[in-house]
Amino acid sequence: GRLWLLAALAGSLAGDVLLLFPGYFVPGLVSFLLAHIAYLVLLRQGMGWFPSRGALAVTLGVGAAMYAFLWTGGLPAGLRAPVAAYVTVIALMAAQAIGRATVQRDAASRAVAVGACCFMLSDTLLATNKFVAPWPLASFWVLTSYYAAQVLIVGGWLRGQTVAQAGVRPGAESLRFQ
């Protein structure tokens, strides 16, 4: 599991660096896409694919709505396919995280699910600012939601692994950490 976590963090770091430079949006997008695939595989461990069909439908619906908003808001034609792929993958990652939380029903998996949703929020804010209309303090809100996402996903995952290794039954752990 830790290799997938490290791969997700490495992909995110590469994306962070690439997005600092003009003209590197697509390579940065691809780096984050690979990071989300790594998170998706990580969150699949010990669990079926998309255990909550409702979460899958909602996250894909939110992703489709965001993509339509970007399309009509000025997303360049050359970015439509890469952005569509990215939106699909991040929605799948969020669906897997939410589904995992519905099965495990503990604080750690809920933190991961909230983190996945924060990632979707961060990317929505970033894309809206970049392709639709710039807005005040965009960088602050994008980075705040992005770092919250990473902290919640990584911290939640590591906490869940620690609890699992300690042999605490699912659900009981949430009482200990509150």
Question: Which positions does each model-derived feature cover?
Answer:
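Polytopic alpha-helical membrane-helix bundles and their juxtamembrane interface segments
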Residues: 1-178
